[in-house]
């Protein structure tokens, strides 16, 4: 019994630590045997416990592992204690899926349904696709294959098959490791070693080839502004004070610069509201543009155009956009791109955050929210955007804009490659969960798009991580971010980002190949079990 428990505990420790921002070693080891140790322990426990109890053990194991992975959600300073309920529901949902899948793997081995094991990696991709595409706005964080991205070679494997391919390989390798423990066949061992090495060999060969041909002959000169204010600090300041702080940061920018990027919802009031007076802001305006004449009242657009004129560049800034539709006021989370000539291009966030930006469940969901969680009942309706966010930064350079956690969804960002974006730009605010792991977790998930699509990215975040990353996933520049050991900091990251890009399989085909495999796997598994049901049940192991 001690040996069985030690297997389960060891697997728990490995998988808990298997996060690219926590441990690279644990991430690599977990990809090849972390889950197989759990299944080996459950396999032996079936002889002593009922299937119901085995499922409960798998559920508790997964719930606690996911609890560690999503521990950043428990920073309730700004979001309130109601987040514990959301956290618990999310963990229970994920634990139900993986506990059921784990019992299916063990059951197939107990029944000697070895042929079914071939279909199970694809079945898992189908299960994970449900939460990736179907749960509210989608849960893109912490997919099974994420630990594979802890190394440059593992991330580069994503340029072929994306998140689904990474999850498929991790599950396949662990099933083979489980089979090696049970069958001790040389074929199983050889297949396991092949699956373990395959993503690193393929990704590594591609990575080294691209690194050899990498060129920085064409660059984009960017200035990324990190204001360093949390939601609490933002609420305690006037809009004019916020602008004075932003202009003060911009004073450190050296020309020439092609684009200045500010974070998500950097200032209140939207683009066109006349919320500022000349009397209150005249000293700052004169320091920005000494010879420009201003009216008595002016807008956020006037501020942005002044910065664009001062630095002779494009300015991208996140802010809210209000629109009256049929007498009902709607709110968009928007990015405004203003060229140095004054041309305005807007992008509205398409993937909204459940609870924070909309209440799931329509009128019923809103009614329940008002009853049980009145602090989360939104006084207005937020709408998702309908169009992609490719904008012109210069005459020759295009950027694909995303806001907040949109950048973690490959299917949402992939069209930017087809629309000939040269660089990805993300505006975000991770300050809602202060002193947590979220800034790094979000950053590591978002930068996967670089190698999936073969283009660089820049991201501006209020409290970090603000960074520039090239198309091979290498960090070109980064500012300090808020964590338990590092306080909130302000700054401007000014760097030249190489625009070297390359074609990828994922950019061309997306998730379609693996989703097709997933559908075929589900059909194949059902057909296999149906056929076996008609046969005499075989004897179990031992």
UniProtKB/Swiss-Prot annotation:
It holds the Pfam family LNT_N. It is a multi-pass membrane protein. Residues 220-499 form the CN hydrolase domain. Pathway: Protein modification; lipoprotein biosynthesis (N-acyl transfer). Keywords: Acyltransferase, Cell inner membrane, Cell membrane, Membrane, Transferase, Transmembrane, Transmembrane helix. Catalyzes the phospholipid dependent N-acylation of the N-terminal cysteine of apolipoprotein, the last step in lipoprotein maturation. Its main location: membrane. GO terms for molecular function: N-acyltransferase activity; N-carbamoylputrescine amidase activity. It is found in: Cell inner membrane. The active site is at residues 264, 349, 404. It is an enzyme of class 2 (transferase). GO terms for cellular component: plasma membrane. NCBIfam families: lnt (TIGR00546). Belongs to the CN hydrolase family. Apolipoprotein N-acyltransferase subfamily. This is Apolipoprotein N-acyltransferase. GO terms for biological process: lipoprotein biosynthetic process; putrescine biosynthetic process from arginine. Its EC number is 2.3.1.269. The chain crosses the membrane at residues 24-44, 54-74, 85-105, 116-136, 160-180, 190-210, 509-529. It comes from Chlamydia trachomatis serovar D (strain ATCC VR-885 / DSM 19411 / UW-3/Cx).
């Amino acid at each position: 019994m001690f040996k069985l428990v030690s297997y389960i505990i060891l697997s728990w420790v490995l998988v808990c630590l298997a996060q690219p921002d926590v441990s690279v070693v644990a991430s690599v080891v977990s990809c090849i045997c972390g889950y197989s140790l759990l299944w080996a322990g459950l396999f032996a426990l079936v002889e002593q416990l009922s299937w119901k109890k085995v499922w409960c053990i798998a559920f508790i194991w997964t719930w606690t592992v996911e609890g560690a992975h999503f521990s950043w959600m428990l920073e309730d300073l700004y979001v309130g204690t109601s987040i514990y309920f959301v956290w618990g529901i999310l963990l229970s949902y994920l634990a139900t899926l993986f506990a059921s899948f784990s019992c299916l793997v063990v059951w197939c081995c107990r029944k000697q349904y070895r042929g079914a094991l071939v279909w199970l990696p694809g079945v898992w991709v189908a299960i994970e696709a449900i939460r990736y595409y179907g749960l509210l706005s989608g849960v893109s964080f912490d997919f099974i294959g994420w630990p594979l991205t802890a190394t440059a070679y593992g991330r580069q494997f994503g340029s072929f098959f994306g998140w689904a391919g990474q999850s498929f390989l991790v599950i396949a390798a662990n099933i083979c490791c489980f089979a090696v423990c049970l069958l001790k066949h040389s074929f199983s061992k050889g297949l396991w070693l092949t699956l373990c090495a395959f993503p690193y060999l393929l990704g590594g060969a591609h990575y080294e080839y691209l690194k050899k041909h990498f060129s920085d002959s064409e660059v984009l000169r960017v200035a990324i502004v990190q204001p360093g204010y949390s939601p609490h600090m933002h609420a305690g300041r006037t809009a004019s004070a916020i602008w004075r702080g932003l202009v003060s940061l911009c004073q450190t920018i050296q020309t020439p610069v092609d684009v200045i990027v500010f974070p998500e919802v950097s200032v209140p009031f939207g683009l066109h509201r006349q919320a500022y007076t000349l009397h209150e802001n005249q000293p700052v305006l004169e320091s920005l543009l000494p010879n420009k004449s201003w009216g008595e009242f002016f807008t956020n657009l006037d501020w942005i155009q002044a910065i664009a004129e001062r630095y002779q560049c494009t300015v991208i800034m996140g802010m809210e956009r209000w629109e009256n539709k049929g007498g009902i006021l709607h709110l968009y989370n928007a990015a405004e791109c203003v060229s140095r000539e004054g041309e305005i291009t807007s992008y509205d966030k398409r993937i909204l955050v459940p609870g924070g930006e909309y209440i799931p469940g329509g009128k019923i969901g809103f009614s329940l929210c008002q009853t049980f969680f009145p602090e989360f009942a939104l006084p207005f309706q937020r709408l998702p955007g309908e169009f992609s966010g490719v904008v012109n930064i210069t005459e020759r350079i295009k950027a694909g804009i995303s806001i907040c956690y949109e950048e973690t969804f490959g299917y949402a960002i992939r069209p930017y490659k087809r629309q000939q974006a040269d660089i990805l730009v993300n505006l975000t605010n991770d300050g809602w969960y202060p002193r947590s792991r979220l800034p790094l977790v979000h950053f590591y998930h978002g930068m996967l798009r670089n190698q999936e699509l073969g283009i660089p990215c820049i991201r501006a975040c209020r409290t970090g991580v603000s960074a520039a990353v090239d198309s091979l996933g290498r960090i070109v520049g980064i500012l300090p971010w808020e964590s338990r050991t590092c306080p909130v900091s302000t700054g401007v990251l000014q760097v030249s980002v190489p625009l070297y890009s390359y074609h990828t399989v994922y950019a061309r085909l997306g998730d379609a190949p693996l989703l097709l495999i997933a559908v075929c796997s589900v059909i194949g598994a059902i057909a296999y079990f149906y056929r076996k049901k008609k046969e005499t049940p075989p004897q179990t192991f031992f």
